[in-house]
Amino acid sequence: MNAIAARITGMQHIGLPTAEVQKTIDFYQGLGFTIATRHDINGRDFAFMKLGNLLIEVIPNDKPTMRAGAVDHICLNVTKIEELYKKIKDAGYKMIDQNIVDIAFWEKGARYFFIEGPNKERIEFCEIVK
C-alpha cells in the first residue's frame, strides 16, 4: 500500500447538486434515507442524507446541469430485489428499467434496476446473487 492509499479509508459521500433541496430530501427520505445533518451556510441550505454507510450531500445550486455527468449513477446494495422492485414501482418512482435486469457480474451474477431521481440522477438498486 502506498503512502496516499494508507490515508484513505473509503468513500465519504457523493455530492448531488439541486435547485430543489427539499424535494431532493423528500425523495431520498422516501427511499429510507435520514437527514444526518443539515446546515445553513451563507443562506444556502445543505443537507447530508444517510442510509447505512452511504452518505449523499444535497448541495443547493441555482443552475444544476440536470443531465448525466462524470458520475453515472449511485448504486444501493439490496436484498430481496423482487419485493423491493414492486414496492418502489408501486410507490410511483420514475422507473428507468421496466424489469429487473440480470447480469453476469460477480461469481453468480447480479440483478439490478434503475430509477430516476428529482435531479435526473440515476439510482441503481443491485443484489449480488449468492
Give the positions of each predicted feature.
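N-terminal beta-strand motif that seeds the catalytic metal site of vicinal oxygen chelate
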Residues: 1-22, 71-74, 126-130
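Core segments of cupin and vicinal oxygen chelate
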Residues: 16-55, 106
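Helix N-cap motif at beta-to-alpha junctions
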Residues: 20-21, 78-82
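Short, well-ordered beta-strand micro-motif
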Residues: 48-50, 77, 114-116
